[in-house]
Amino acid sequence: MAPIRPKYISFDCYGTLINFDMAGAARDLYGDRLDAQAMDKFIRNFSAYRLDEIMGAWKPYADVVHNSLSRACKANGVTFKDEDAQMVYERVPTWGPHPDVPAGLAKVAKEIPLVILSNAMNAQIMSNVEKLGAPFHKVYTAEQAQAYKPRFQAFEYMFDMLGCGPEDMLHVSSSFRYDLMSAHDLGIKNKVWVNRGHEPANPYYGYTEIADISGLPGVVGL
């Protein structure tokens, strides 16, 4: 396959670059109240409710976490406390990258401008970005776009801010549901799926698969 050389490479941040450990936070809160099987179900519910919470009008991510955690607790017969949701939210900016990320990003950043499009709050995202070990041309948040991915509005905001179109981008994500399905529908032909085990492969959406970010330089011929 010929190398892809886009004008920009855009990335999902949480999960793809940052080790987004919502599951670990939930285990810390409720692991002593739920057995292993019930805890796994709780984590699946918490993840599903987070996706559901971002589908409508934009709201602060603290509210997304609060509502989705509350719903997961209700579904699993666990007592919910407001302070538990606040604890989870405050952990987000403390999380760092997957081990493969800094070296792979740094190599690509020397040749192609890197962009983040993240379901993040302005007050939190730079604490994560600073841990990535590579320079970013631009960092765009759901708060700025007033929409969370997978809503098209988030991607369209990025296009408008960069002054480019889908044909100019290579979009990189570990998630089909949040990123790659929307990228496909919006005409981003060049996509990379980072297989971090979050979701199963879905070849319909047309992408290059890599195991981790160390494989990205090869995709763009570096």
Model-derived regions, located:
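N-terminal helical cap/lid subdomain that shapes the substrate entry/recognition surface
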Residues: 2-99, 110, 121-123
